[in-house]
């Protein structure tokens, strides 16, 4: 199974943030999770977000060298593997998955989380709850995602932690 993640926005709750785009026939097990917009990256302190950057999107990403994800018990359209466990070891140089908690150096829970300095240390991650994600063209597609995993920060010193660019600000 192939799972592709695109960037999510930071101005809405996570559960309402991602939409679904199928990338295969009903007999295939491939699908794509895609967001409605591709904008500057930001983590609002009220939620945990999946932040994944495409090449033509923002480069203001806190890059994590390796993230361990466990996905299980999901159904997407006609694809159902509720009894199986899929495990992904995802290297994360900008184009792949990074699961981050809100940066401690965020000034406020406001949407325009403008940071004056880089976050210190490694972001902490606590994802042991099931997240229900839905919405695509006003259709409700049930997708239960159980994330019971640990993020491995193999090279914390290389984190590019949410620096405010000289010419652009976070939104």
From Swiss-Prot:
Knockout-associated phenotype: Strand-specific deletion mutant, which disrupts only mbiA, shows no difference in growth compared with wild-type strain at 37 degrees Celsius or after heat shock. Biofilm formation is increased at 37 degrees Celsius.
Protein name (record): Uncharacterized protein MbiA
Annotated source species: Escherichia coli O157:H7
Lineage, opening ranks: Bacteria, Pseudomonadati, Pseudomonadota, Gammaproteobacteria, Enterobacterales
């Amino acid at each position: 199974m192939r799972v592709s993640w695109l960037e999510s926005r930071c101005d809405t709750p996570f559960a309402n943030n991602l939409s679904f785009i199928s990338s295969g026939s009903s007999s295939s097990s491939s699908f794509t999770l895609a967001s409605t917009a591709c904008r500057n990256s930001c983590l609002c302190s009220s939620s945990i977000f999946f932040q994944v950057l495409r090449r033509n999107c923002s480069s203001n990403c806190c890059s994590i060298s390796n993230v361990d994800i466990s996905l299980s018990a999901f159904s997407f359209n006609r694809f159902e593997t509720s009894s199986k466990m899929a495990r992904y070891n995802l290297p994360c140089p900008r184009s792949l998955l990074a699961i981050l908690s809100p940066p401690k150096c965020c000034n406020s829970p406001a949407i325009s989380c403008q940071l004056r300095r880089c976050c210190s240390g490694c972001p902490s991650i606590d994802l042991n709850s099931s997240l229900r994600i839905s919405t695509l063209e006003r259709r409700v597609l049930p997708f239960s995602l159980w994330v019971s995993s640990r993020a491995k920060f193999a090279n914390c010193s290389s984190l590019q932690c949410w620096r405010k660019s000289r010419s652009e600000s976070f939104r």
